[in-house]
From Swiss-Prot:
Keyword set includes Metal-binding: no
Xref: NCBIfam families: membrane protein insertion efficiency factor YidD (TIGR00278)
Role description: Could be involved in insertion of integral membrane proteins into the membrane.
Species classification: Bacteria, Pseudomonadati, Pseudomonadota, Gammaproteobacteria, Alteromonadales
Record key words, sorted: Cell inner membrane, Cell membrane, Membrane
Protein name, UniProt field: Putative membrane protein insertion efficiency factor
Keyword Cell membrane recorded: yes
Sequence similarity: Belongs to the UPF0161 family.
Length: 84
């Protein structure tokens, strides 16, 4: 069953999708990582919520520059503290 999105998650998702549809094709492929930074942000916000997901996405975007080697960098899994 799908979890309901908060209004901030919904807004962030729409802004990122707008970037992917309208801006990214103009700029061309430049991301050094897989998944791309925008797909990483979508997944992080979906999995961890707006605040923590935005934190992960911001850290990832700051790493995306020519001096970083890039490569495979998946979203960290959500820790379920109730099961520990």
């Amino acid at each position: 069953m799908a979890q309901a999105q908060s209004p901030l998650q919904w807004l962030a998702t729409k802004l990122i999708r707008g970037y992917q549809i309208f801006i990214s094709p103009i700029l061309g492929p430049k991301c050094r990582f897989h998944p791309t930074c925008s797909n990483y942000a979508l997944e992080a916000i979906r999995l961890h919520g707006f605040v923590k997901g935005s934190w992960f996405a911001g850290k990832r975007v700051l790493k995306c520059h020519p001096l970083h080697p890039g490569g495979e960098d998946p979203v960290p899994p959500k820790n379920n503290r109730c099961n520990k």
